[in-house]
């Protein structure tokens, strides 16, 4: 009898395929501030969070609240962070994007006002404020896509700290193994044609080839539904 495919096990949701969220430190969000006011806080620590690639800053605000915020480049222990409509537009501060001059870099941008921040949160990335209109602001995302947002959406001024991560090689499989343990992914990933026949429909044989058509029906049963699912065409486009 064959075994379940990886896609079937992933759908079942066993611990191997679940993110170890119990080890994550905090759900990053911007502090809530009343309109036309500002809130100040001091950075008391810079920490690593297994949930993300960028460092996080622990900030003690003047209202007694302590929050973890996404650290931008230049933020250090002892710095003062301002948040709100009256906050100065400088790296590390949290301000509405409608107050940010054109050409400035921003990160951890809200999708809707007061949702806490949804976009541009990976290490070393940034978005650019392009232009302002009375009811919306255009922001150039890291992908190059222009996104129009409510000018009351808040963002952190500056570039996310931890840049250059993608330029550094893994060097050892063990380092990547430990990194992947913090994600909802199975590592290493084995090629289907390298498996045994009991593990995958493309497994087995004297050499590495699928042994059957790689196109498969949309209505195929779960144990067979692998390869090019309901493909309109295969190969290079001519």
From Swiss-Prot:
- GO process terms (BP): cytoplasmic translation
- Keywords from the UniProt entry: Ribonucleoprotein, Ribosomal protein, RNA-binding, rRNA-binding
Instruction: Tell me one GO molecular function of this protein.
Output: structural constituent of ribosome
Q: Which domain of life is it from?
A: Archaea
- Stretches with biased composition (Polar residues): 1-11
Entry annotated with the keyword Ribonucleoprotein: yes
Statement: the UniProt record of this protein carries the keyword RNA-binding: yes
- What Pfam families does the annotation carry? Ribosomal_L2, Ribosomal_L2_C
Q: Where is this region: Disordered?
A: 1-22, 202-223
Q: Which GO terms describe its cellular component?
A: cytosolic large ribosomal subunit
**Functional summary from the UniProt entry:** One of the primary rRNA binding proteins. Required for association of the 30S and 50S subunits to form the 70S ribosome, for tRNA binding and peptide bond formation. It has been suggested to have peptidyltransferase activity; this is somewhat controversial. Makes several contacts with the 16S rRNA in the 70S ribosome.
Q: Which HAMAP family match?
A: Ribosomal_uL2_A
Give the family, as the similarity comment puts it.
Answer: Belongs to the universal ribosomal protein uL2 family.
What do we know about how this protein assembles, alone or with others? Answer: Part of the 50S ribosomal subunit. Forms a bridge to the 30S subunit in the 70S ribosome.
Q: Which NCBIfam families match?
A: PRK09612.1
Q: What is this protein called?
A: Large ribosomal subunit protein uL2
This chain's source organism reads Methanosarcina mazei (strain ATCC BAA-159 / DSM 3647 / Goe1 / Go1 / JCM 11833 / OCM 88) (Methanosarcina frisia)
